UniProtKB/Swiss-Prot annotation:
InterPro entries: Isoprenoid_synthase_dom_sf, Terpene_cyclase_plant_C1, Terpene_synth_N, Terpene_synth_N_sf, Terpene_synthase-like, Terpene_synthase_metal-bd, Terpenoid_cyclase/PrenylTrfase. This is Terpenoid synthase 8. Belongs to the terpene synthase family. Tpsa subfamily. Its cofactor is Mg(2+); Mn(2+). One of its GO terms (molecular function) is magnesium ion binding. It catalyses: (2E,6E,10E)-geranylgeranyl diphosphate = rhizathalene A + diphosphate. Stele, and tips of primary and secondary root. It is found in: Plastid. It comes from the Eukaryota. Mg(2+) 2 binds at residues 352, 356. Pathway: Secondary metabolite biosynthesis; terpenoid biosynthesis. SUPFAM superfamilies: Terpenoid cyclases/Protein prenyltransferases, Terpenoid synthases.
Amino acid sequence: MEAIKTFSPKFGFQISLSPRTHLTPVRFPPTACPVKPANLVRLKATRALIRDPQESNRKFQKFPPSEWTNRFDSVSVDASEMDALRKEIDKIIPNVKKELMSSQGIESTKKKILMVYLLVSLGLAYHFEDEIEECLKEGFETIEEMMAGEDNLYTISIIFLVLRTYGHHMSSDIFQKFKGNDGNFKGCISGDAKGLLALYEAAQLRTTTEYIMEEALSFTSSNLELLAADGRCPPHLSKHIRNALGLSQHKQMEVLVAVEYISFYEQEKDHDKILLKFAKLNFKLMQLHYLEELKVVTKWYKEHDFASNLPPYFKYVIVENHFFAITMYFEPKFSQKRIMLAKYFTVLVLLDDTCDRYASLSEAESLTNSLERWAPDDAMDKQPHYLKFVFKFIMGCFEEFERELASEGRSYSVKATLEEFKTIVKANFDFAKLAHTGHVPSFKEYMEVGEVEVGVCATLAGNLMCIGHIGDEGVYEWLKSRPKFLKAASTYGRLMNDIAGFEDDMKREYVITGVNTYMKQYGLTKMEAIRELQNLVEYNHTIMNEEFLKTTDLPRQIRKQVINVARSLNVSYTEGEGFTHTKGKVDEYITSLFITPIRI
């Protein structure tokens, strides 16, 4: 096995784990790292599969390796091309900044906010964070004056959308002007495709008590479906509408919004040629960054030789893990952090697959005890090879994170993430115990465990660990307090997972799910239960929107991470169980990000 050059070789996999191997406790975090680690000779990993003797007696779904796993480990990225792209981008940025900081005045502010929407949609906003904050602060302070006399549905909706996206609580009462005396939205706006689409997107940021935005969502959805289907819109606009109805901008990954919007914007007759070129150059540069990262993570993945050490219950999805890391932060400056986050997601997937799909109850208990102690329990020495491998791999990954972040003075973030990880370890074992008994608990009892097991808080902890100094110790205290924001996100994730994965769970005779517990408790049919749970999903979506606006004591970048975790769930589960069965939308998204070239 080739040495991993990014990290010190001291803490890599240096021993061969056979069923007879006694695991020496490896304490974490390491406290006695020599400045210059001893030179170690690594043995090449064996290619012979070490089989679990009980494998043939277990019921489990075999997962073939993802077709993406071998696609990027030998990819070649031209550094000079990346430099050339950066130079072209750097020439454009000052001109865009001038527009954002141009003359003052109400009409000028409106135009600048509409421009911010373009920058967000094209994936360019991160270049202008300070300028955008200043522009929106000015706009929100003069919002009443700015909206006085304004009756353009598109303009009002976009201003509402942008201000809410950046944490400014603009009132939804402004949309009353588009309702008639009968209390319904006026029929005269039903043919305004762009205005309706903007209102539809604005309604995605509604809070729990904004009934007018609930009405707006219903009104726009039905009318947009008709407009997209009856040929009244240009083909590119119809396609844009259908994409939004499938997954709105607010619920979609930011970089995927950019991919789709660049294509749409190019076909708009009044598009800004410079801005369009900027967006294409920027996406091309990001795509090259992603390819570089994929080369690193797929090489790391293969060096651990999962195929030889694990039965085929494990999902080989390192490219997919990296794809979901992009959901959390897509900007080029987070390149190294995405690599670390993809590794962390691999840990989460391995833990979940092991406890949920393969391990016996006694094996899951031994793994749980060992991870909670951060040392092998008394039973680990007697466990099959695969379980020892899982335990050693997880410990090795956290040690790797510690080594990388210690140099940044951020060891606290690894410790805090490890503690959060241990909560999901326990929840996985609690789920395994429930499944073993065959007893279907009440919906409330199920959710108490399920909201932890789905891993929203553990995912967020990993995001904060990787994001940098903005994820300080105070943020982890907020995370540990389990505020309403995180409770809603966890409920949202648990129910989306259960609804999307219901048929898959039933096929493998896994009955302890949210759908089943809800059916049993309330005497409902499957479809009735799913409809009610979908309503709960949407309600928790509005709670997250509300808490995003209320939680002003945290930086917006941290609050946005909660929204980004929800976005990853949307991408995974809106059209089936997209993470377990990646064929379909997730495959399309991966192709658009990593494979399809953009024409500049």
